[in-house]
Each structure stands twice: as structure tokens, then as C-alpha cells.
């Protein structure tokens, strides 16, 4: 039986399997097979909105909280809400990250719908919004328009998405690839650019690392993250949300008592310091 955290809950009844996030920390052998089921079964729903939703739930989102509720409206529409119990009051008090996650959800929904030839008319905050935080009002309403879109080449890469948690190579990205990314990033009325390996890149690496230090060294934000960690394959399979810690290194660390919620919350522990060292190396290897 699927747990609450294993499904996308549809308001009014029904569900679509939800997914363990690719954005969490994955070490060595990757996530549990059962938690990856929605990635393998995406696109198998027969009803077109549910089929699009089976891809949308794979969207990256903060701490992999999967903070969405969906109501199917009539035969050609749906309404997206935020599951307010899945916000991050310490880490994300103004719901900025949660809103970005909903944006990713809507973009994947549109890409998946376009694959089936449906356009999507998306209205953000149709009943208004509280500028300070999310509330019970809808985040978006979506109407599907038959024949209203052509498939987007980006859709082919949806299931290959991952969040890199390894050191970046010390080389520049090829100019052709950068140009392609800048073009894709400029298609929505914004300007995308790159900075290369310049002093600005060094400044951004430093800001990234110092921001991570601040979040980790603030007890409330660190504890919120620790509480959402799924340590080892059994925990990931039981609750395929949150921040997954898996792999051979994690398994050994858990066995010898180095990797557990107590040590990860203890700023004086070796496990806590190793986590900081790992993220510093990641941040400082990033390229512009």
C-alpha cells in the first residue's frame, strides 16, 4: 500500500504515484528501487491529465517535500494547490523555494502535455495571493487545449535529470553548449548569460559556500533538514520524500554510528564536519 508520502494526492479522491527526488543527496549505488518506481512508470497513466501529472511529480523541489495537491476539474482542467503541511518554516519562511518548486512542477506538466499535443493555459494565483507566504488559495489553474502545442525537445531529457553531488571537472564548458543553454534560458522574456572562470565566478562560489555554512550552523534550519533525512535504503523506501542518504558509505557510517540524526545535528561531531567539508569542495569546484 502506498504511503501518504508515496502518492500525489488528488483533491476529491484518487492519486498518482509520487517520486523520490533526484535532487536529494545520492551516494554510491543510488536510491532504493521501490522509491524509483514513479520514474520507471511515468507516462503509463491512460487519462491525459494524469499522464502529464505522472511527469510533473518528478519536478525538483526543496528538500524533496513534494508540496503539491491537485484537483481535476471537468474533463480538461486542473487546479494546483500547495500542501501547507509540507512547507519549510525554518529553511524557507517566505515560501520562496516552495514557489520555485511549484513552478518546476508546472513546467514539467506543460512539457508532458505538449508531448501528447495539448497546450496548457496556466493562470498563476487565480484567486489572488498573500505576498508574504502561501495560503490555502490555488497556486495555479491549468486548462488543457487539444492541438495547442508541439512536443518540446527538452521533454526527452525529463527522466535523465539529476542533481550533481560530485566535484565538477576543472575545465570550461564548451562554447556551443553554453550558447544552447543561454538560448533556452532566454526563451521566456528573461536574459540568460554565463560568466566563465572569472572573478565573478569566484565571488559566487564564495557566496554559495558561506550561505551553506550559515544554514548548517543555524540550529533551526539544520535541524529541519536533519528531520527530513531518510538514512539508508529502508528509510528511503518507507518514506520516499525528504533528503535521501544512501549508498555503501552511508550504510557503513550508519552501522558504526557515525551517520545518524544525532550526529548530523551535532555541530561538534565528525559526521557534521565531514558533511561541511564535502559541500565546501563541491561549491569550490563549480564553474561559471
Tell me what each language-model feature is.
Residues 2-288:
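Acidic, surface-exposed loops and disordered segments
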Amino acid at each position: 500500500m502506498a504511503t501518504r508520502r508515496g502518492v500525489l494526492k488528488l483533491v476529491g479522491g484518487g492519486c498518482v504515484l509520487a517520486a523520490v527526488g533526484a535532487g536529494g543527496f545520492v551516494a554510491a549505488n543510488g536510491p532504493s528501487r521501490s522509491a524509483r518506481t514513479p520514474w520507471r512508470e511515468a507516462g503509463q497513466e491512460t487519462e491525459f491529465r494524469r499522464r502529464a501529472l505522472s511527469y510533473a511529480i518528478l519536478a525538483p523541489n526543496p528538500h524533496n517535500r513534494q508540496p503539491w495537491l491537485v484537483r481535476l476539474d471537468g474533463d480538461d482542467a486542473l487546479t494546483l494547490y500547495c500542501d501547507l503541511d509540507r512547507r519549510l518554516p525554518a529553511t524557507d519562511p517566505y515560501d520562496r523555494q516552495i514557489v520555485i518548486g511549484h513552478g518546476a512542477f508546472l513546467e514539467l506538466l506543460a512539457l508532458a502535455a505538449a508531448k501528447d499535443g495539448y497546450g496548457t493555459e496556466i493562470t498563476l494565483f487565480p484567486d489572488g495571493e498573500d505576498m508574504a507566504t502561501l495560503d490555502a488559495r490555488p497556486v495555479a489553474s491549468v486548462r488543457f487545449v487539444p492541438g495547442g502545442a508541439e512536443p518540446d525537445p527538452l521533454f526527452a531529457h525529463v527522466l535523465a535529470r539529476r542533481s550533481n553531488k560530485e566535484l565538477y571537472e576543472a575545465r570550461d564548458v564548451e562554447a556551443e553548449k553554453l550558447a544552447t543553454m543561454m538560448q533556452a534560458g532566454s526563451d521566456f522574456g528573461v536574459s540568460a548569460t554565463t560568466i566563465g572562470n572569472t572573478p565573478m565566478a569566484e565571488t559566487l562560489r564564495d557566496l554559495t559556500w558561506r550561505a551553506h555554512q550559515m544554514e548548517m550552523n543555524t540550529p533551526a534550519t539544520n535541524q529541519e533538514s536533519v528531520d527530513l533525512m531518510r538514512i539508508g535504503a529502508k528509510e528511503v523506501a518507507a518514506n520516499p520524500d525528504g533528503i535521501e542518504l544512501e549508498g555503501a558509505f552511508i550504510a557503513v557510517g550508519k552501522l558504526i554510528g557515525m551517520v545518524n540524526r544525532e550526529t548530523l545535528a551535532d555541530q561538534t561531531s565528525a559526521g557534521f564536519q565531514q558533511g561541511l567539508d564535502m559541500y565546501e569542495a563541491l561549491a569550490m569546484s563549480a564553474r561559471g
